[in-house]
Amino acid sequence: MAKDGGVSCLRRSEMIGIGIGELESPPLDSDQVHVLAVDDSLVDRIVIERLLRITSCKVTAVDSGWRALEFLGLDDDKAAVEFDRLKVDLIITDYCMPGMTGYELLKKIKESTSFKEVPVVIMSSENVMTRIDRCLEEGAEDFLLKPVKLADVKRLRSYLTRDVKVAAEGNKRKLTTPPPPPPLSATSSMESSDSTVESPLSMVDDEDSLTMSPESATSLVDSPMRSPGLA
C-alpha cells in the first residue's frame, strides 16, 4: 500500500536492512561491497537490486531520499546508530524523486563528514546534459541512464574493488621479488682494487703496442743473439 504521496513503503527485507523491526540485520562481510540503492519506483528498485546482487553486492534498498538519510543517520544532524558497524561502499540513487531529488540527496551526503568520501552514482531516464553536469560538479561519481544494464553495475563494482586488488597484488609482488644487492662501501671498493693484479701488457696503451718505427724493427732483426755469459 502506498503512503507519503504515492511513495511505496519499504518491503520487509528492506525494513530489516535498515534496522526497523524485531529482526536484526546480519553482520556485513568485510570483503563484500555494500550498496545503498535509492529509488521511489518499485520496479526500478527491484531491477537495480537484482543487478547488484548478481555481482555479489550486499544491497540495502530504500524508496526515498529521506529514508536514505535515516539509514545513514544524517537526518536532523543525528549520528548514525552503531556507526562503526555501518559500512556503505556505494550509494546509487534516482534523480527524480518526490520530496527530495537525487541531486539534493547527493549534496547532503557530500556535506556530511561521515559519508562525503563514499561514491555516489545518479540514475535517470532523462538524458539532460545540464542535469548531468550539475551532479558531476557536485561530486557524483557517475551518471547512468535508465534502464541500467548489468555491464554498468559490473563496471561500478570493479571500480570499487580495484584499489584493494591492486594493493594485494602489489604486496604479493613485493614478497616474491628478491631485494637488490646492497651498494659497495668505500672500504670494499679499495679492497677489490688492491686484490686485482694487472698484467704489464695491460698497462700498455693499444696504440703504443701497435706503433713501431721501421728503424727500430730493423735494429731488432740485425742485432746478434748473445748467449748468457759470453762477452
Swiss-Prot record:
Keywords attached to this entry: Cytokinin signaling pathway, Nucleus, Phosphoprotein, Transcription, Transcription regulation, Two-component regulatory system
Stretch list, region Disordered: 170-231
Major subcellular site: nucleus
One GO CC term on file: nucleus
Keyword Lipid biosynthesis on entry: no
Induction: By cytokinin (zeatin) and nitrate.
Tissue expression from the record: Predominantly expressed in roots.
Modification sites for 4-aspartylphosphate: 94
Gene Ontology biological process terms, A to Z: circadian rhythm; cytokinin-activated signaling pathway; phosphorelay signal transduction system; red light signaling pathway; regulation of DNA-templated transcription; response to cytokinin; response to red light
Compartmental location: Nucleus
Keyword Nucleus: yes
Compositionally biased spans, kind Polar residues: 210-221
Top-level division of the source organism's lineage: Eukaryota
Family indicated by similarity: Belongs to the ARR family. Type-A subfamily.
Protein name per its UniProtKB record: Two-component response regulator ARR3
Organism: Arabidopsis thaliana (Mouse-ear cress)
